[in-house]
């Protein structure tokens, strides 16, 4: 039985983006498909949703399909300002083509600001509808770096994701 015959597969993803230098009210950061108000925006080629990028990488990794950068390179103008939801759905299609579906996933968002936890219920609702996965199959949490490093200085945001698929 080859690797693709295994009943379960696991992938891990990571992404990081820096914040814009300008600070003004009315900006937002896309996180798990939700616009979270912040005084800075995101520097990115696509919409810059670090959590969806990490999930996409985890799902692609789970299937042995490389990385988000291989499928949607930031050097390709067609992905300029592209929706991260599209990337994740394309990765899910690749999994389905190999007869796999998402069993569960865990996302950790790393930043000092903005505060993430108040938005988690909406994030879960969004991901549940997008991926057709029950909210009981997902976990989203946020941590800080205790003011250490570039994330601790408030220069950006990162996300880690672990995802498990099962053979359907």
From Swiss-Prot:
Keywords: Isoprene biosynthesis, Lyase, Metal-binding. Its cofactor is a divalent metal cation. Its EC number is 4.6.1.12. CDD domains: MECDP_synthase. The keyword Transport does not apply. InterPro entries: MECDP_synthase, MECDP_synthase_CS, MECDP_synthase_sf. Binds 1 divalent metal cation per subunit. Pathway: Isoprenoid biosynthesis; isopentenyl diphosphate biosynthesis via DXP pathway; isopentenyl diphosphate from 1-deoxy-D-xylulose 5-phosphate: step 4/6. It catalyses: 4-CDP-2-C-methyl-D-erythritol 2-phosphate = 2-C-methyl-D-erythritol 2,4-cyclic diphosphate + CMP. The record marks 45, 144 as: Transition state stabilizer. One of its GO terms (molecular function) is metal ion binding. It comes from the Bacteria. 4-CDP-2-C-methyl-D-erythritol 2-phosphate binds at residues 15-17, 45-46, 72-76, 150, 153. Pfam families: YgbB. A divalent metal cation binds at residues 15, 17, 53. Homotrimer. Belongs to the IspF family. Involved in the biosynthesis of isopentenyl diphosphate (IPP) and dimethylallyl diphosphate (DMAPP), two major building blocks of isoprenoid compounds. Catalyzes the conversion of 4-diphosphocytidyl-2-C-methyl-D-erythritol 2-phosphate (CDP-ME2P) to 2-C-methyl-D-erythritol 2,4-cyclodiphosphate (ME-CPP) with a corresponding release of cytidine 5-monophosphate (CMP). PANTHER family: 2-C-METHYL-D-ERYTHRITOL 2,4-CYCLODIPHOSPHATE SYNTHASE, CHLOROPLASTIC. This is 2-C-methyl-D-erythritol 2,4-cyclodiphosphate synthase. The lineage of its organism: Bacteria, Pseudomonadati, Pseudomonadota, Alphaproteobacteria, Rickettsiales. The gene is ispF.
């Amino acid at each position: 039985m080859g690797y693709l015959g295994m009943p379960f597969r696991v992938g891990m993803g990571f992404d990081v983006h820096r914040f814009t230098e300008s600070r003004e009210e009315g900006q937002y950061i896309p996180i798990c498909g939700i616009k979270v108000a912040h005084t800075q925006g995101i520097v990115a080629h696509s919409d810059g949703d670090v959590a969806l990028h990490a999930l996409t990488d985890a799902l692609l990794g789970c299937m042995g399909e490389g990385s988000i950068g291989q499928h949607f390179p930031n050097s390709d103008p067609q992905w300029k300002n592209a929706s991260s939801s599209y990337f994740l759905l394309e990765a899910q299609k690749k999994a389905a083509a190999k007869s796999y579906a998402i069993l569960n996933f865990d996302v950790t968002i790393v930043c000092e600001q903005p505060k993430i936890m108040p938005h988690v219920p909406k994030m879960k609702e969004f991901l549940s509808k997008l991926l057709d996965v029950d909210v009981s199959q997902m976990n989203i949490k946020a941590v800080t770096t205790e003011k250490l490093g570039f994330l601790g200085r408030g220069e950006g945001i990162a996300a880690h994701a672990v995802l498990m698929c099962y053979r359907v």
